[in-house]
Amino acid sequence: VLAGALLHDVGKLKEISPDMGFPYTTGGRLLGHITITVMMVSEAAAKLGSIDEKKLQQLLHIILSHHGEQDKGSPVACATKEGFVVHYADEIDAIMNQFDVNNTEGTWEFNKMLQRYLYL
């Protein structure tokens, strides 16, 4: 779970450019951060050489399923408890970040992502 939590979005480092406005890279647009992450982790595992294949598959499943469902962008749906843990932790993190969109405390604001008013 810890490795999945730490690595699931590492592909964003290659998906998004550090240039002004943080545009997507060509590779980012063509492959997306999930595919890029799987490639990076697979390459690192191959360099290590002696990694347990079952553990690698479980880690790759966490990465591939961290958006939860295929209709939400995951190539595969969560099928392990570790996958669900990382998915829901990532989802809670995204929800909590919505409270930081507007820093005006004590106000109500409609949030398009969550489709509801939030009290800030």
What is each model feature region?
Residues 1, 87, 104-105, 109-120:
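N-terminal intrinsically disordered, cationic/polar leader segments
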Residues 1-102:
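Divalent metal-dependent catalytic cores for phosphoryl transfer on phosphate-bearing substrates
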